[in-house]
Amino acid sequence: MNSTTKENKETIRPVFPFTAIVGQEEMKLALILNVIDPKIGGVMIMGDRGTGKSTTIRAIADLLPKIEVVKDDLFNSHPMDVDLMSDENKKTLQDGVALTTSYINVPMVDLPLGATEDRVCGTIDIEKALTEGIKTFEPGLLAKANRGILYVDEVNLLDDHLVDILLDSAASGWNTVEREGISVRHPARFVLVGSGNPEEGELRPQLLDRFGMHAEIRTVKDPELRVKIVEQRTNFDQNPRRCIEDCQKTQNDLKEKIAEAQLLLSNITIDYDLRIKISQVCGELDVDGLRGDIVTNRAAKAYAAFNGQQNVKSSDIGKVITLCLRHRLRKDPLEAMDSGEKVQKVFNKIFEEEN
């Protein structure tokens, strides 16, 4: 048993530690808040090539505690929460049969650009269903990503209808596959993370609006910081095990902080006057719909929980509001101001009495 575990540890590809990543604080914060509260709705990360987008996203999964699942279940079903459980397991539970469980690492699923709809959603064996009357379902990537993270690199190059499917599943928490009158559904609640380079094309505004947060990252200009980043990467490439060991304490501290924030989240309160001001900011920025208001409220609570507070302060809102609103503003070709700066300016104006 021990030798097998040792072999498995040796064969696992080392992941660059999250806490060793230098700079890019906005991207790191967006990922942490989505992990604390997946209902924020995922994050879109846009930035230059070679700025550590993929490295950071893959590193976040390493910070998450193991999750309890129904053993040998195709959908990583939760053993008690019916909203995160397949219909088959739900029926087993209702029949009074105990479910066998096991612990697994939080799934981190990569969605390749060339993926088909069947690969994403899963397929039903129509022939078997018609001839033998057996509903056979081959799970797709959405099933594997349930209760985990689904990462789409170059999401701006993915087919729009696939992005739609991902966003629908992420919002509803369920994936339904229908073929020839036969229907199968399963839980598909995950944190959707997309990344891309704006030079290669933008997402449609309707799709962009569905992402909870939008982080923009730039190439680091400070020479000292660049040298530090190069050193960190060189150390990791030369001796990944040692680099991981050196960061073990900071990794564990952050892991504990995230776990505590997840427990604290449901008790966080946000005063009515602060909620009014959030909606005032959204109104003044002419944000369509109410997604901006909802996500900003959620993100502010997650940020307060991350800092171990019971109540949301205006400074907490200031830290997250740009991430939540910058991609929801209408594009104005004559506007000289960056959308993030515009959000911050309106926030400062409305919250100035408290600052």
Curated annotation (Swiss-Prot):
Keywords: ATP-binding, Chlorophyll biosynthesis, Chloroplast, Ligase, Nucleotide-binding, Photosynthesis, Plastid. Pfam families: AAA_lid_2, Mg_chelatase. Its main location: plastid. It is found in: Plastid, Chloroplast. Its EC number is 6.6.1.1. GO terms for cellular component: chloroplast. SUPFAM superfamilies: P-loop containing nucleoside triphosphate hydrolases. One of its GO terms (biological process) is chlorophyll biosynthetic process. ATP binds at G47, D48, R49, G50, T51, G52, K53, S54. Pathway: Porphyrin-containing compound metabolism; chlorophyll biosynthesis. GO terms for molecular function: ATP binding; ATP hydrolysis activity; magnesium chelatase activity. Belongs to the Mg-chelatase subunits D/I family. Involved in chlorophyll biosynthesis; introduces a magnesium ion into protoporphyrin IX to yield Mg-protoporphyrin IX. This is Magnesium-chelatase subunit ChlI.
